[in-house]
C-alpha cells in the first residue's frame, strides 16, 4: 500500500512555444517562390486532474519539478510545428491547489475528472509567411515562441466526508467505522493504530448513504503539532458533522470531551460550529451504575458549554453509550440515523445549489424563461414518439461539434455534476406521462451531453420504477472509456453513441473535443461498452460533405464500426442549422450512396432514419410552451418544428408569430435559412 502523503510542493513550468520558420519556396522553374515558413507549435500545459482511484500523493512525493514539452519549431512548406505534450498531475478528490509563494488558493478540486491548468504553454512563433506584405514579399525573419508560465505550487488533499470521527487514541473510532461501513482499517489495542485517515460508506437504503472519515487520534496539544493530530486535522474541515468518540473507561469523560473541542477550536473556530454527536464507547467494560454516572457527567458538561457558547453550536449533540463490538439492532439504527440526520441540512443545501438555471450563451446570462427538464413528445427520426429528458444546461458538452445546432461553445467539459435534482425531474416526468400517450421512448437528449449528469444511473433507476417505457441515452460516447460511466449506462435499454470520424485529424476537425479526450481512448470506450452492454446498441455516424464522406474517410470509419459491431448503424447528416458554415449536408442521393458503401463493407444493419409511421400518429396539439421548450434546446425552422411535432406548418407559423411579437422568440438567418431561437 502506498504511503499516505497529503501535502506536496513542486516547481511547475509549461512548455515554451516553438520558433517560427524562416523558409522560402525552392522549386524548379519557380524563381520567385516566396516565403513558406510555418508557425511554431504551442508549448504544452501543466494540468492537475482528479483521479478517483488515487487517495494520496504517494506516487509523486519524490518529484520536485513538472515541466511540459516545448512546441516544435515551424518548418518549410508552411508546415506548423507540433504542439508540445501536456503534463498531467493526477491527484485525489479533495485536492486544493495553492500558489506556494503567495499562499493563494488556485483551485479546489472536488469531482472525479475535474481539471485545472496550473501553467499554460507559450504560444508558438509566427513563420516568415505571416510577415509577407505588398512591400516586403520576402521577409527574412520570424517570431520566436513565447515562454511558458512558471510557478511554484503546493497540493493539499482534504478528505471529503459527511461525518468525521474525532477522539483520543485507542477509543474505538476504527472499530466504529468498521462496524458501520465496509471499511477495513487497522484495529489493535494500542494508541495510534490509525496512522492515516480511513474512509467508509454507510448505506441506509438505495437513496441514502453517507461517508465516514476516521481521523488519527488527537492528543492534547495537537493543534500546536503534538502527536499526529495537526497533520490530519485538515481532513475534518470538509466534514458535514463530527462524532466525538470517547472511551468510557477514562477517569473524567467530561474533561476528555472539553480537551477534544478545545483542540479543534485552537485549530479552527469553524470546526466547533459543526453539528456533533457523542459516542461513549466500551460500555462492556463498566458496571451500569458507572455508565449512568459518566453519561450524566458528560450531559452536564455539554449543557454548560452549550449555554455559555450558543454561537458556536447548532444544537446540543445527541449522546449514545454503547459497545462498538456489540453494536446492532435498535442501537445501530439510532446511531446511523443520527449520523444521517446531522447532515440533512447539508444535503438539502447541496440540492438547492445544484438547481442551476438554464444557461443559453457563453457569458452564462440567466434565462428569464421557465423551462422544463422533461419536454415533448417530439417526433424523432429514429425513435418515434420520444419524450425528452434534458439533464444538462445549455451547450454543456465534452465536444464543440461544428454541426451542433445549439451554436459554438469552446468551454468544453469532462467533469460530472448534478445540475438538476432527480426528484424534480421525476415529478415532471410523472406529469408528462399522465398527459401523453403512445410514447415509444424516454430519451436523454437536449441541451448537451447527458453523461455529464452525475446522478444519471440513479435517475434511470427511478424512471424504471414508474414506467415500462424503454429508456434511450443519446450520447457522443466521449466518456465511455471510463469504467464507471460504462457501468452507469448498463441499466438503459438503448444507447446511441456517435462516431463522426475514423482518424484523429478528422475527429478534431468535426468534434473539436475537450483536450482530455483522446481519439483512441474514445474508440476503445465504444468497443468495450459494446462488449458489456446487454441492451440495444445503435451507432450514429454523422456525415458532412467534403469532410468525412470520401472513400478514404468512410473506410476509416467502417474499420472501427466492424470492431464495435453495433446492432445498427444510423447514417445522418446536417438537416438542421449548424454552428459552422463548413458543416454542409449530403443530399439524398449522396446519403444513399454512402449507405450502399457501408452495406458493401460491413455486415451490420445500415439505416438512414426518417420520420416513422408510428410517430406520425401523434395527435397532441402543440402549444407555445411546447415550442419554447423545443427551441431552447434546438433552434430550428418552421418546417422542422412542424415535422418534430407532427403539426401543420400554418399552426406552427401562427404560434411563432405570437412568440416573436411577445419577445420570447427571435428570427435568425443562419446559412441563408430563416430559423427561430429563444431570447434570453
UniProtKB/Swiss-Prot annotation:
SUPFAM superfamilies: Obg GTP-binding protein N-terminal domain, P-loop containing nucleoside triphosphate hydrolases, Radical SAM enzymes. Gene3D superfamilies: Aldolase class I (3.20.20.70), GTP1/OBG domain (2.70.210.12), P-loop containing nucleotide triphosphate hydrolases (3.40.50.300). One of its GO terms (biological process) is ribosome biogenesis. It is found in: Cytoplasm. GO terms for molecular function: 4 iron, 4 sulfur cluster binding; GTP binding; GTPase activity; magnesium ion binding. Mg(2+) binds at residues 174, 194. It is an enzyme of class 3 (hydrolase). This is GTPase Obg. It comes from Brachyspira hyodysenteriae (strain ATCC 49526 / WA1). The lineage of its organism: Bacteria, Pseudomonadati, Spirochaetota, Spirochaetia, Brachyspirales.
Amino acid at each position: 500500500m502506498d504511503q499516505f502523503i497529503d501535502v506536496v510542493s513542486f516547481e511547475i513550468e509549461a512548455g515554451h512555444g516553438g520558433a517560427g520558420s524562416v523558409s522560402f519556396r525552392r522549386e524548379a522553374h519557380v524563381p520567385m517562390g516566396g516565403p513558406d515558413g510555418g508557425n511554431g507549435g504551442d508549448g504544452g500545459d501543466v494540468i492537475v486532474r482528479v483521479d478517483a482511484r488515487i487517495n494520496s500523493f504517494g506516487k509523486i512525493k519524490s518529484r520536485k519539478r513538472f515541466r511540459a514539452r516545448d512546441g516544435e519549431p515551424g518548418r518549410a512548406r508552411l508546415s506548423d510545428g507540433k504542439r508540445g505534450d501536456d503534463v498531467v498531475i493526477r491527484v485525489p478528490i479533495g485536492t486544493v491547489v495553492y500558489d506556494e509563494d503567495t499562499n493563494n488558493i488556485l483551485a479546489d478540486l472536488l469531482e472525479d475528472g475535474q481539471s485545472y491548468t496550473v501553467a499554460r504553454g507559450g504560444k508558438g512563433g509566427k513563420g516568415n509567411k505571416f510577415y509577407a506584405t505588398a512591400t516586403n514579399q520576402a521577409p527574412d525573419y520570424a517570431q520566436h515562441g513565447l515562454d511558458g508560465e512558471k510557478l511554484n505550487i503546493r497540493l493539499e488533499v482534504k478528505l471529503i466526508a459527511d461525518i468525521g470521527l474525532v477522539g483520543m487514541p485507542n477509543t474505538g473510532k476504527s472499530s466504529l467505522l468498521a462496524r458501520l461501513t465496509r471499511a477495513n482499517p487497522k484495529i489493535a489495542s494500542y494508541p495510534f493504530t490509525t496512522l492515516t485517515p480511513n474512509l467508509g460508506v454507510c448505506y441506509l437504503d438505495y437513496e441514502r448513504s453517507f461517508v465516514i472519515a476516521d481521523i488519527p487520534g488527537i492528543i492534547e496539544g495537537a493543534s500546536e503539532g503534538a502527536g499526529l493530530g495537526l497533520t490530519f486535522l485538515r481532513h475534518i474541515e470538509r466534514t458535514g458533522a463530527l462524532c466525538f468518540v470517547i472511551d468510557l473507561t477514562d477517569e473524567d469523560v467530561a474533561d476528555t470531551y472539553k480537551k477534544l473541542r478545545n483542540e479543534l477550536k485552537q485549530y479552527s473556530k469553524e470546526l466547533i460550529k459543526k453539528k456533533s454527536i457523542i459516542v461513549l464507547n466500551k460500555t462492556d467494560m463498566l458496571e451500569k451504575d458507572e455508565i449512568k454516572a459518566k453519561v450524566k457527567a458528560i450531559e452536564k458538561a455539554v449543557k454548560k458549554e452549550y449555554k455559555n457558547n450558543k454561537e458556536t453550536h447548532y444544537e446540543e449533540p445527541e449522546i449514545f453509550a454503547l459497545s462498538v463490538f456489540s453494536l446492532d439492532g435498535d442501537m445501530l439504527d439510532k446511531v446511523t440515523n443520527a449520523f444521517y440526520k446531522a447532515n440533512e441540512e447539508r444535503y438539502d443545501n447541496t440540492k438547492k445549489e445544484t438547481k442551476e438555471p438554464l444557461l443559453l450563451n457563453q457569458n452564462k446570462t440567466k434565462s428569464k424563461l421557465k423551462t422544463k427538464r422533461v419536454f415533448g413528445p417530439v417526433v424523432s427520426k429514429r425513435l418515434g414518439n420520444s419524450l425528452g429528458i434534458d439533464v444538462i444546461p445549455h451547450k454543456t458538452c465534452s465536444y464543440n461539434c461544428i454541426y451542433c445546432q445549439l451554436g459554438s461553445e469552446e468551454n468544453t467539459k469532462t467533469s460530472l455534476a448534478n445540475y438538476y435534482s432527480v426528484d424534480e425531474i421525476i415529478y415532471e416526468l410523472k406529469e408528462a406521462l399522465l398527459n401523453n400517450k403512445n410514447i415509444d421512448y424516454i430519451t436523454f437528449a437536449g441541451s448537451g451531453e447527458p453523461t455529464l449528469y452525475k446522478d444519471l444511473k440513479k435517475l434511470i433507476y427511478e424512471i424504471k420504477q414508474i414506467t415500462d417505457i424503454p429508456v434511450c441515452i443519446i450520447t457522443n460516447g466521449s466518456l465511455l472509456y471510463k469504467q464507471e460511466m460504462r457501468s452507469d449506462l448498463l441499466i438503459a435499454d438503448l444507447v446511441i453513441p456517435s462516431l463522426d470520424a475514423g482518424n484523429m485529424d478528422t475527429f478534431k476537425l468535426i468534434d473539436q473535443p475537450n483536450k482530455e479526450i483522446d481519439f483512441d481512448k474514445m474508440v476503445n470506450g465504444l468497443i468495450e461498452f459494446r462488449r458489456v452492454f446487454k441492451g440495444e446498441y445503435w451507432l450514429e455516424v454523422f456525415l458532412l460533405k467534403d469532410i468525412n464522406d470520401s472513400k478514404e474517410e468512410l473506410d476509416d470509419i467502417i474499420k472501427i464500426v466492424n470492431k464495435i459491431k453495433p446492432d445498427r448503424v444510423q447514417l445522418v447528416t446536417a438537416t438542421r442549422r449548424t454552428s459552422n458554415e463548413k458543416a454542409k449536408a449530403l443530399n439524398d442521393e449522396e446519403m444513399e450512396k454512402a449507405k450502399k458503401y457501408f452495406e458493401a463493407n460491413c455486415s451490420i444493419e445500415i439505416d438512414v432514419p426518417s420520420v416513422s409511421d408510428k410517430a406520425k400518429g401523434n395527435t397532441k396539439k402543440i402549444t407555445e410552451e411546447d415550442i419554447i421548450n423545443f427551441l431552447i434546446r434546438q433552434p430550428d425552422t418552421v418546417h422542422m418544428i412542424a415535422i418534430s411535432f407532427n403539426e401543420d406548418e400554418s399552426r406552427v407559423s401562427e404560434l411563432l408569430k405570437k412568440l416573436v411579437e411577445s419577445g420570447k422568440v427571435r428570427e435568425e438567418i443562419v446559412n441563408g435559412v430563416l430559423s427561430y431561437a429563444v431570447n434570453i
